[in-house]
C-alpha cells in the first residue's frame, strides 16, 4: 500500500495525521440485509478514512471503490480538522486522495463526499473567515469540469475561485 500512496507523494505521516488506516478485512451487512466481507490484497488494497463513528472505505483498484460504515455524518468534510486556524488559500478537491496529496506537499485542502456533492454555504462562510482564497480544484474529466462550473456558479456570491490543471482528464 505504501507504493500506492508514494505515487501521489503521500507519506506515512500524512496518512496518520488524516486518520487513514490500512484494512486487512472489512465486514458489514448489505442493504438487502446479507452479511458480506472483503479482504485486502496486494492487487486490491483497502483503506479507511475514519471520521469519528463513521468510516469511508476506499478500494482504489476495485470496481466497487467506496463503501460506508458506521453512523454517517451530516456534513462530510474530509481534512477539515487538519486545517490551520488561518491561511492564505485552501483547495476544495474532488476526493480524499487529492486532499492527502496536496497536504503532503504543504497545501491546505478539504473535500466533500464527492465532486457532485452540494457544498454547504455555512461551511464556505466559515472557511472565508479563516482563508483569503477558496479554490475549487476538481478532476479534469467530464464530471470534474461540469461540477467545477456548477459549484463556481452556485457559490458566486462568495467569489470562490477555480483552477483547472492541464491534465488529460483520466483517473
Features from the language model and the residues they span:
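Modules that initiate DNA replication and primer synthesis
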Residues: 121-163
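A generic structural-conservation signal
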Residues: 14, 24, 111, 162-164
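Short phosphate-binding/catalytic loops that engage adenosine nucleotides
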Residues: 10, 106-107, 158-160, 170
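Short, small/acidic-rich helices and loops at N termini and domain boundaries
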Residues: 1-41, 85, 154, 171
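Phosphate-handling DNA/RNA-contact segment within nucleic-acid enzymes
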Residues: 25-132, 147-148
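Flexible loop/turn segments at secondary-structure boundaries
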Residues: 99-100, 143-144, 170
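Short, acidic/turn-prone active-site loops that include or flank metal/cofactor-
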Residues: 113-118, 139-140, 165-168
